[in-house]
């Protein structure tokens, strides 16, 4: 559902899966289950990494070797979520003001309507909702692990509010991002609900460090591009050297042996999409030449390589 963003998966899980706990990580964001791991955070209280590698999953205790540890931690709490963002430090705005500032994509009147719905249908949440929206503490991304009973109650509350919102608001003139308004509201609603639980229910909770990975593509083992007569040619390059390699490939194409298949592989870390398109254009309609691009960034993320 394009309107509900990641909440689409949450709704499906609510309606189709019966488990003891429900958990969601989204948009290359993960919680670390290693309490002793202390890394530098940005102003948004997030640890940012270039690549999600085995090194990171091991350090964060989120690979298969730590399943028992994860299970034990989850069993001890009703809710696990991210360590919150201090918006005063990050941008100097409250939760409400931050939403209002994003006036190009979002409309603050929608946040006001959401608040009206809470007041009308769930008045016991209203004061907490106002406190959360007017405060500087934020929980983003709908990222959490929650016990079944709480999750079911949360989803019933959440989707009832969003359903009522869609009845009241005409989004037909909204931008593509504007259509995602229910998903954006859902982020704020999680913070409100979590804050309400902390203040009104005797729950146990734990807040974990949030990590963001710019690239989560895995490095798969390369196989030959052709099943026979495969001649591999590996090249190390970046965008700066692309024109020189284009000249080299042009020379190769002028001297091809029709009895051979040429498997050209660029080992790179930062080729732009346009660069790749231009290389592939060189071999258009040439059946015995393939060009592939292999991002080696994850392999060398924690290596110190010096060029002389």
Where do the language-model regions lie?
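Short, surface-exposed alpha-helical segments at coil->helix boundaries
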Residues: 187, 246-249, 273-280
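Short, solvent-exposed loop/edge-beta patches enriched in aromatic
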Residues: 14-22, 229, 241, 254-261, ...
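Active-site-proximal specificity loops/subdomain of glycosyltransferases
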Residues: 1-16, 275-276, 280-308
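Alpha-helical structural signal in soluble globular domains
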Residues: 193-196, 251, 255, 278-286
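Short internal beta-strands
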Residues: 262-270
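ER/Golgi luminal nucleotide-sugar-dependent glycosyltransferases, focusing on the catalytic module
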Residues: 1-225
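General small-molecule cofactor/ligand-binding pocket signal
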Residues: 206, 265, 290-294
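N-proximal low-complexity "stem/linker" segments adjacent to membrane-targeting elements
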Residues: 219-250, 254
């Amino acid at each position: 559902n394009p309107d509900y963003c990641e909440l689409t998966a949450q709704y499906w899980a609510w309606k189709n899966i019966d488990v003891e706990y429900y958990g969601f990580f989204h948009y290359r964001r993960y919680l670390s289950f290693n309490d002793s791991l202390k890394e530098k955070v940005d102003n948004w209280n997030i640890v940012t990494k270039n690549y999600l590698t085995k090194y990171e999953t091991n350090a964060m205790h989120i690979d298969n070797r730590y399943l028992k540890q994860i299970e034990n931690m989850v069993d001890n709490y009703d809710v696990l979520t991210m360590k919150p963002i201090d918006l005063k430090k990050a941008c100097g705005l409250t939760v409400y003001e931050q939403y209002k500032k994003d006036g190009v994509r979002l409309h603050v009147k929608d946040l006001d309507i959401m608040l009206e719905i809470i007041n009308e249908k769930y008045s016991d949440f209203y004061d907490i909702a106002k406190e959360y929206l007017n405060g500087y503490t934020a929980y983003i991304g709908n990222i959490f692990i929650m016990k079944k009973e709480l999750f079911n109650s949360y989803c019933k509350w959440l989707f009832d509010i969003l359903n009522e919102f869609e009845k009241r608001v005409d989004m037909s003139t909204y931008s593509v991002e504007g259509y995602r308004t229910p998903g954006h509201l859902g982020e704020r609603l999680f913070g409100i609900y979590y804050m309400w639980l902390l203040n009104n229910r005797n729950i146990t909770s734990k807040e974990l460090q949030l990590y963001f990975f710019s690239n989560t593509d895995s490095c798969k083992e390369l196989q030959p591009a052709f099943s026979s007569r495969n001649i591999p040619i590996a090249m190390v390059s970046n965008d700066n050297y692309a024109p020189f390699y284009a000249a080299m490939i042009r020379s190769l194409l002028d001297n091809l042996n029709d009895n051979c298949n040429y498997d050209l592989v660029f080992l790179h870390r930062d080729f732009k999409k346009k660069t790749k398109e231009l290389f592939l254009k060189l071999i258009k309609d040439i059946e015995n030449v393939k060009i592939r691009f292999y991002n080696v960034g994850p392999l060398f993320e924690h290596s110190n390589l010096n060029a002389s």
